[in-house]
Structure formats: C-alpha cells, structure tokens
C-alpha cells in the first residue's frame, strides 16, 4: 500500500518522503513527531491509519506529496522544471506522485494551471 509511493519519493527526496508521511499521519489524528525517521512509532501510526482508512491513506499521502513538490517549486526557481514543463503541463514530480493516487484525486489540468501560473 504505502511502501511503493514512499520509496518512490525517498529515491529523490530522502527523509522528506518520511516527513510527508508523518504529516499525512497527523492529518489522520495520529500522535506522531515529524522527524523524518521511520521508527516504531511511525510504523505503528501508519498501521493504525491504514486500518482506520484503508481506502484513503495512499491518496492522502499522494496529495501531500504533490503539495510538497509544489511548495518546493514555489520556493526554489531552479527546481520548477520538475513540477511543471515549459509548456505548462505537469512535470515529472507531479506525474510520479499521481501515479500512486486514484484519478479522482489528481489535479485537473485547469487547477494545475491556476496553481502553477505564478511559477513563470
């Protein structure tokens, strides 16, 4: 369930993938610290959240992952090319994140255009 998307993000983002997971778990009312370490508390919280909302945890992680990438693009102009193509379409980061999400949670082209219009 979450193994593939967390690993996929970890390849490029390192411990930020775990921090995104931990922030997602907080949205599921898990009492956890965002420290970027997969320890026993993160594992237990992930298992609990998965039991409570098995159909939503992966999608929620994907949404948080997209938000992380867009925030990174906002803050660091040299990384914008990974979030949005020159033509204004979804870049590799966004496509990879959405690959693990159900389509109904993908950003629509119009919402993506609005969200990234200021990126230049």
Explain the meaning of each model-derived region:
Residues 52-120:
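Low-complexity, Gly/Ser/Thr/Pro-rich intrinsically disordered linker/tail segments
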């Amino acid at each position: 369930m979450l193994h593939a998307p967390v690993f996929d993000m970890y390849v490029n983002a390192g411990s930020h993938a775990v921090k995104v997971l931990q922030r997602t778990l907080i949205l599921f009312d898990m009492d956890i610290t965002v420290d970027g370490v997969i320890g026993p508390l993160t594992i237990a919280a992930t298992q609990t959240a998965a039991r409570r909302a098995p159909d939503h945890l992966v999608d929620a992680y994907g949404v948080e992952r997209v938000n992380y990438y867009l925030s990174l693009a906002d803050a660091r102009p040299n990384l914008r090319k990974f979030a949005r193509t020159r033509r204004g379409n979804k870049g590799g980061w966004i496509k990879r994140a959405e690959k693990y999400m159900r389509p109904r949670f993908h950003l629509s082209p119009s919402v993506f255009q609005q969200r990234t219009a200021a990126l230049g």
